[in-house]
Amino acid sequence: MSQNDSGHFLISEENWSLHRKGFDDQQRHQKKVQEAIKNNLPDLVTEESIIMSNGKDVVKIPIRSLDEYKIRYNYDKNKHVGQGDGESQVGDVVARDGSDKKQGPGKGQGAGDQAGEDYYEAEVSLMDLEEALFKELELPNLQQKERDNIIHTDIEFNDIRKTGLTGNIDKKRTMMSAFKRNAMSGKPSFYPIYPEDLKYKTWNDITKPESKAVVLAMMDTSGSMGVWEKYMARSFFFWMTRFLRTKYETVEIEFIAHHTEARVVSEEDFFSKGESGGTICSSVYRKSLELIDEKYNPARYNIYPFHFSDGDNLTSDNARCVKLVNDIMKKANLFCYGEVNQYNRHSTLMSAYKNVKDEKFKYYILKQKSDVFQALKNFFRNEESGVSHQFS
């Protein structure tokens, strides 16, 4: 604090924008983290440490180091000449290295003589991944059903009153009311504030009906489904389950495992226990129809069946599968089939499903880990966006 010639005191004359430097750097860092998540999302979705975590673990991803701009000493010790006419723009080259660079950063088994880029590992939580992934997903073709007796309640501050709770005082309107009253008496000031100046924000309860929905998660657990195939299927269902429970309050999930026979299992068994035996996929479709008839009336529920298999089905069972899938689609909003086929081998089930022409039928073939992310985007995208059947 200093006193000038006029007798007034100055608190500070410095450029306060410089104090934002730390905040700006933090914002740049967060932006880089979000870019890294977006660029690595297909791989992060199938990261084993996340799939097998308790929801609280973190994963590390590489992010390019953010160095401050500054003049550096030229360790190559080459001569440079830089000149300009005073009209240089941001990004113009000031000087170029005159040396003939035939070497570069080391890569693979070759050794280089140039410095590489600095990277560091940033920790990313499961919540960060969910935020990046789920904003692109939604239940397609969600319809308003009969007898929707579950409502979602929200609160909206949309009214101002002269009485209310102390914690809901609208400071801006209160001070403006006091200023106007004081100005009318010839003393324009925010103070004093009298009880009649107080303004309180009040809210109204907003209710809206939400349509019920059920997702039938069906997974092939037969002997032909190896460790990698089951891991891919469970990775998809892991993210599907978290997505549904995060964005929809009224969605139920039924877990069905099958080999030659199908049975409804607990969520824990679905994600942990393996089985063996042959494959008869029609068994899981019959079980789905039984559940729909017993518990999920199509007039009250949006129905979304998801089936994951390796496609190695009993050949004589394929015709029954096609018939049952058509029966399910008459009651469901959508039918999604995911096939884990890493080596592009012949699939008896996929050969039969290629003849299904119903718009409700969608499939995706997963050949590598990043395809889990693509399958999620393909299945959980609104029909209005023009989704079609896709291969990886």
UniProtKB/Swiss-Prot annotation:
Tree of life domain: Bacteria
The keyword Ribonucleoprotein is annotated on this UniProt entry: no
Keywords: Stress response
Biased composition (Basic and acidic residues): 94-103
Region (Disordered): 78-115
Pfam families: DUF444 (PF04285)
Cleavable signal peptide: none
Swiss-Prot/TrEMBL induction comment: By phosphate starvation, via the PhoP/PhoR two-component regulatory system.
Family from the record: Belongs to the UPF0229 family.
PANTHER family: UPF0229 PROTEIN YEAH
Name this protein carries in UniProt: Stress response UPF0229 protein YhbH
Source organism (scientific name): Bacillus subtilis (strain 168)
Organism phylogeny: Bacteria, Bacillati, Bacillota, Bacilli, Bacillales
